[in-house]
């Protein structure tokens, strides 16, 4: 007896006759409703930038978290469901600390990304005794930035458990126009400051609200300073530099 489309929708571990997992596809679509996040890799660093949607004038901007530290040399930007992201990030933090404790070295960026994607597949109904983290796919995508022995690296992970390495990448609601601008403006010899300006320029173009230092946030990963989320003063300076380029 054949299953209907709605039954394939409900079965998170069941492929349709066309070879599709609808719940995973829906999770990917949910990310397209999320706030825009952008990552740019330079020769010496990786810069992340995110849109912070303030749904009320009474909301404190510091409470809207879209950038997270995983380890001293790794951080990420998220788009999608923040609650899902916290589960993934907590898992990644434990994995990186276990690796550091066991091997007395920082975990590689790709290994960290792999552990995140392994977790992304642990949804639905498992076998007896098999732990499942979620009853559905995670509704969040990550831009994972870090520096290891291979230099600066930028990865994108999605709910399907797929990940790819990028030189520049945008996710979220403004990802399509942002990607077009990144393709046009990105070059491999960019400095860190140029990457900051490019990210803010692209965010300014795709955001519905006027960009200022309160509704965007930047972070960077460098060999000297590790992962660092910009404070209010640094954000104001970065936005001012981008504004000067426009003028």
UniProtKB/Swiss-Prot annotation:
Alphabetized InterPro entries for the sequence: Ntn_hydrolases_N, Proteasome_alpha, Proteasome_alpha-type, Proteasome_alpha_type_5, Proteasome_asu_N, Proteasome_sua/b
Subcellular location(s) per record: Cytoplasm; Nucleus
Any one Pfam family match given in the protein's UniProt record, by short name: Proteasome_A_N
GO cellular component terms, A-Z: cytosol; nucleus; proteasome core complex, alpha-subunit complex
Example GO BP: proteasome-mediated ubiquitin-dependent protein catabolic process
Alphabetically ordered keywords of this record: Cytoplasm, Nucleus, Phosphoprotein, Proteasome
Positions of post-translational Phosphothreonine modification: 55
Family membership: Belongs to the peptidase T1A family.
Protein task: The proteasome is a multicatalytic proteinase complex which is characterized by its ability to cleave peptides with Arg, Phe, Tyr, Leu, and Glu adjacent to the leaving group at neutral or slightly basic pH. The proteasome has an ATP-dependent proteolytic activity.
Quaternary structure and interacting proteins, as annotated: The 26S proteasome consists of a 20S proteasome core and two 19S regulatory subunits. The 20S proteasome core is composed of 28 subunits that are arranged in four stacked rings, resulting in a barrel-shaped structure. The two end rings are each formed by seven alpha subunits, and the two central rings are each formed by seven beta subunits. The catalytic chamber with the active sites is on the inside of the barrel.
Protein's name according to its UniProt entry: Probable proteasome subunit alpha type-5
